[in-house]
Amino acid sequence: MRILIDADGCPVVDIALKTAREKNIEAHIFCDTCHVFEKDGAETHVVPKGADSADFAIANFVKCRDIVITQDYGLASMVLSRDAICINQDGCEYTEENIDGLLFARHTAKKVRNAGGRIKGPPKRTKEQDVRFSEKLVEITERFCK
């Protein structure tokens, strides 16, 4: 088991790395050349800048039972097809049961934006979201390290 972090725009990198250290789990950070992260306790993979370049690097690197942290539904779908675990920065676990609905919602939102509509962005991040993420990550590591 490894923890792979889609670090571009990810607010929980430090929380994930703390859990990886505590559980003695190998950690990898993926970012493009515009967002280089160098963190102790993790191997950083820097990919060329480009649409979804970090996502494809993760999809090619992920193995069965890895944990991937991302907010990208497309990447989550690819990760699930590799029998890995995938959660977002709020601690929501992507599953075979919910990914199709999430991808459809993303498609619908894109159609609204392309038609000139506006979709409200997320509210400011809270400490409760950090706690929820941390608890979920610990729960997943304990579930699969038994």
What is each of the regions a protein language model found here?
Residues 2-146:
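Nuclease catalytic cores that cleave nucleic-acid phosphodiester bonds
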